[in-house]
Amino acid sequence: MKRVKILSLTIAVFCFFISFVEFNFSSVFAMPFYDFQPKEIVLRAEFYTSYPSSTDERKTNIMLAAKSLDNILIVPNEEFSFNKTVGERTEKRGYKSAKIIVNGEFVDGVGGGVCQVSTTLYNALLLAGLKIIEYHPHSLPVSYVAPSFDAMVNSGWADLRFINDTHNPVILRTFADGSILKVQVYGEPLKEKFIRKSVITGEIPAPEYEILTDTLREFSDLYEGDMKIISYSKAGYKSEGYLIKTVSGKVISSTKIRSDSYSAVRGKIIKGTIPRVKEPLIDSTLITVYRIKRKI
């Protein structure tokens, strides 16, 4: 993969140069030879998700990952790896702590929010008709995309990978402005159009709340007898994802591309432990005597 600086000029020169030279440059310049079939480079597909209510830390992580995915060129038959392209999500590289999913719970972790970038890319790739060879669902439903269309990643084992199975380069453009995240896929023109369809096939009831006690008194306004919801119980889902192919508005095929199960989320309620300050009782007879004496 290569980073493109000037999109249209680079592609035009690159395709022309590679396609019309009559000998293999690999023997001269030690670089691979690609048998491109130059065509007009167009916007094949785009997809966007939103994140206006995210924390500043999560927004930072999204923007860092999006920047790593912008102006990326993938030549024919080349494999793309999200993790290799974006790199490790560490504090040293500027990533912040935000909510991630671990063992079926939302917890704080460095790089929280990057999965929204991989998910947005995943959907753009589907709409662009490219060959996805690795993706992973979340264990819990996420709010920024329909069930069966998410793509979880982490720096360890979970990646998002696809192959450019077209005859020409594919270029990724990625934009994040603090509210909207958009991925565009450029390449040779598509004859068909793809539509996503998410189908809920079953629902997992939301569990009862877990009751916790604020023994460390982390909530300064939570007194004995008070209770506060710190996370909501949510239902889980069983779902299927379909990719519908159309040509000139006519449905050609509808293919089930995946089936998923998302666990229900158990919410948490915390009970206060701070003692209430009792107001001193005042004898009403004393007040009456005091008033009488003042009148005298």
Spell out what each predicted region is:
Residues M1-R3:
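N-terminal secretory signal peptides that target proteins for export/translocation
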Residues I6-F23:
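Sec-dependent N-terminal signal peptides of Gram-positive bacterial secreted proteins and lipoproteins
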Residues F25-I296:
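Well-ordered beta-sheet/strand-loop patches within structured domains
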